[in-house]
């Protein structure tokens, strides 16, 4: 029957197993209560009888009473000793329970049929026969087993799966006395019940009656589990080698304990020693494999003399229980001391590696993260052909540090040298692609700009900031207004913009434009006054009008941020647009013959921040997509 429970069980089977064990514990409890009641009835009958034959009966009664009194005294002393050691033992029990209850089904496989429910739980022999009185130990006091049946039933389940001792087996069974001394089981084990009594059944009932305290009574499940064939095959306690027989059992169970508690030492820990690592470090020797093995070894010398003394019966129960408590305290002592020290030095090499790998580099990465990220991502915009639009959100914070022209994007005026360097840098990356632009007529009536102009977006914030600073109303200005304003404003300065550099080298005129014509909308000036003047030199370049126009408008774009918004008043974007009538002339590339005034239409947009960013990001496609009027 029990083999069904020995492999790892599903939750439902675990619950069923708990119920079965609880009901078995209740049966054992009832059995013991019945025995105790029978004993009381016999005592009452014996008192009622006047005498069973004179001196014989009196002597017999005196002997019984002496034995009962001695047993009661021994039990009281043991209980007192145990009560003193209770807090530490209960704490240690909680730690071990928390540790060992993690794996539910493994112990039965290791220790053989250790939960011997099937052996003799239902036997109904006399009170002193070993099969029946293994249930009759004081371990089955009401509070204990009923508590197991009740709220703390899971604890009972786990307790039955711990490495178990014979501490709950009956004092009446001859073989169990040495076993109780031998096995460091639960912390109710220090019941040295029949340790001092010569007869196996001498103190069974009186002692049980004396020891039926409310706590420290082991669970009946331990007694049931300890009826396994391994412990039961040992010789009786009276035999001279009882102590020697206790030792192998002790070694076996403590080895079981060590093996179970240390099992997780090499396994990877999912957490680098955080909140949930704490209790596990406290309660298990598993985290301290070096300590685990010597601790039971060092405790065993203290335990073995007491075993031998128990075998020869001279040990007093108080001393025995004291030895028990001390040995278990010594075994449990390293555990409370260890938790503070556990995090700092990793105990096992595997664990140290794990903690270092997960925890310490995490901290270093946290400290290094921001500078590392900044250093890693700064270079790409500085490489020549690289598009700056890969990281638009970062424009403003790093603008001034990255390129010279970003100083204007932040609203500050850079030096002409910086502007020159930035312009030539971006232009050189685009010069190779300029000739690849088809010179056919543009698809839409807009000024044609080369498609691959990604480095322009860095100027996106410039008109944005200028437009926001200008704060004028958002509206479309008619072509007439723009013509009038720009004609009035730009005529005197337009030639100065044309003079400095010839068209075929686009970088030169645009460099001059940035600071030579800073106060004006050089786009407007180019469109209104000097289409002829600009296109004359630029005619040799394929798509001359489109290229020079686009490079002029883009080269001038930083000037928007600083000066054009001031002179312009509305701070919008000014886009030159070819009317359909002039499309053929401008698209054909014969810039010199293009009509000057009415063919060029400007639409000045007071656009939102997002719209301007989009327009400036896609310089060529933006007009076609968004602002065709």
From Swiss-Prot:
Cytoplasm listed as a keyword: no
Bias-annotated ranges (Acidic residues): 56-69
Modified residues annotated as Phosphoserine in this record: 6, 165, 239, 426, 478
Entry annotated with the keyword NAD: no
Biased composition annotated in UniProt, kind: Basic and acidic residues: 301-311
Start-end of Low complexity biased regions: 105-150, 316-335, 525-535, 547-568
Source superkingdom: Eukaryota
Residue span of region Disordered: 50-76, 105-574
Biased composition (Pro residues): 336-348
Coiled-coil segments on the chain, per record: 63-87
GO molecular function: delta-catenin binding; identical protein binding; protein kinase A binding; protein kinase C binding
Keyword entries, A-Z: Coiled coil, Methylation, Phosphoprotein, Wnt signaling pathway
Skewed-composition ranges (Gly residues): 536-546
Record note on quaternary structure: Can form homodimers and heterodimers with DACT1 or DACT3. Interacts with CSNK1D, PKA catalytic subunit, PKC-type kinase, DVL1, DVL3, VANGL1, VANGL2 and CTNND1. Interacts with DVL2.
Written domain comment of the UniProt record: The C-terminal PDZ-binding motif may mediate interaction with the PDZ domains of DSH (Dishevelled) family proteins.
Name used for this protein in its record: Dapper homolog 3
Organism: Homo sapiens
């Amino acid at each position: 029957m029990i083999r069904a429970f020995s492999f790892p069980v599903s939750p439902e089977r675990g619950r069923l197993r708990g119920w079965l064990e609880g009901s078995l514990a209740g049966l054992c409890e009832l059995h013991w209560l019945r025995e105790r009641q029978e004993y009381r009835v016999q005592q009452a009958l014996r008192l009622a009888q006047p005498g069973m034959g004179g001196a014989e009966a009196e002597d017999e009664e005196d002997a019984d009473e002496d034995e009962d009194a001695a047993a009661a005294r021994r039990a009281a002393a043991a209980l007192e000793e145990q009560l003193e050691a209770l807090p530490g033992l209960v704490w240690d029990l909680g730690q071990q329970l928390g540790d060992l209850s993690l794996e539910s089904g493994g112990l039965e496989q290791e220790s053989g049929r250790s939960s011997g429910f099937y052996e003799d739980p239902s036997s109904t022999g006399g009170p002193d026969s070993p099969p029946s009185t293994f249930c009759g130990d004081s371990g089955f006091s009401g509070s204990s087993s009923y508590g197991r049946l009740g709220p703390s039933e899971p604890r009972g389940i786990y307790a039955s799966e711990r490495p178990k001792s014979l501490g709950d087996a009956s004092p009446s069974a001859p073989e169990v006395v040495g076993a109780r001394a031998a096995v460091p089981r639960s912390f109710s084990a220090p019941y040295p019940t029949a340790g001092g009594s010569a007869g196996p059944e001498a103190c069974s009932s009186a002692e049980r009656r004396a020891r039926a305290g409310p706590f420290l009574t082991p669970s009946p499940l331990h007694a049931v589990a300890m009826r396994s064939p391994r412990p039961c095959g040992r010789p009786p306690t009276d035999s001279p080698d009882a102590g020697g027989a206790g030792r192998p059992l002790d070694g076996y169970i403590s080895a079981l304990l060590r093996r179970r508690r240390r099992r997780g030492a090499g396994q990877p820990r999912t957490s680098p020693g955080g909140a949930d690592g704490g209790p596990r470090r406290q309660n298990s020797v598993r985290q301290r494999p070096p300590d685990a093995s010597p601790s039971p070894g060092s405790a065993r010398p203290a335990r073995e003399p007491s075993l031998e003394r128990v075998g020869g019966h001279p040990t007093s129960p108080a001393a025995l229980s004291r030895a028990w408590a001390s040995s278990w305290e010594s075994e449990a002592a390293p555990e409370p001391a260890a938790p503070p020290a556990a995090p700092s030095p990793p105990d096992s090499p595997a664990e140290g590696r794990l903690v270092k790998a997960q925890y310490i580099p995490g901290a270093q990465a946290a400290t290094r993260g921001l500078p590392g990220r900044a250093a890693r991502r700064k270079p790409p915009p500085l490489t020549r052909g690289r598009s700056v639009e890969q990281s638009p959100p970062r424009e403003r914070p790093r603008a001034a540090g990255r390129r010279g022209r970003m100083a204007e994007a932040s609203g500050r005026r850079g030096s002409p040298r910086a502007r020159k360097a930035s312009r030539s840098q971006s232009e050189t990356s685009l010069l190779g692609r300029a000739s690849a632009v088809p010179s056919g007529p543009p698809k839409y009536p807009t000024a044609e700009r080369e498609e691959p102009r990604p480095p322009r977006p860095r100027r996106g914030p410039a008109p944005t900031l200028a437009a926001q600073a200008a704060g004028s109303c958002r509206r479309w200005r008619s072509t007439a207004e723009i013509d009038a304003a720009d004609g009035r404003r730009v005529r005197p300065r337009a030639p100065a913009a044309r003079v400095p550099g010839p068209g075929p080298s686009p970088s030169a005129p645009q460099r001059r434009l940035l600071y030579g014509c800073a106060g004006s909308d050089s786009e407007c000036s180019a469109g209104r006054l000097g289409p002829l003047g600009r296109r004359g030199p630029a005619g040799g370049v394929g798509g001359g009008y489109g290229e020079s126009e686009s490079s002029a408008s883009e080269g001038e774009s930083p000037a928007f941020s600083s000066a054009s918004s001031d002179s312009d008043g509305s701070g919008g974007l000014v886009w030159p647009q070819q009317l359909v009538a002039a499309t053929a002339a401008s698209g054909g590339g014969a810039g010199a013959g293009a009509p000057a005034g009415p063919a060029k239409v400007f639409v000045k947009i007071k656009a939102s921040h997002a719209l301007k960013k989009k327009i400036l990001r896609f310089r060529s496609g933006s007009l076609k997509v968004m602002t065709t009027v």
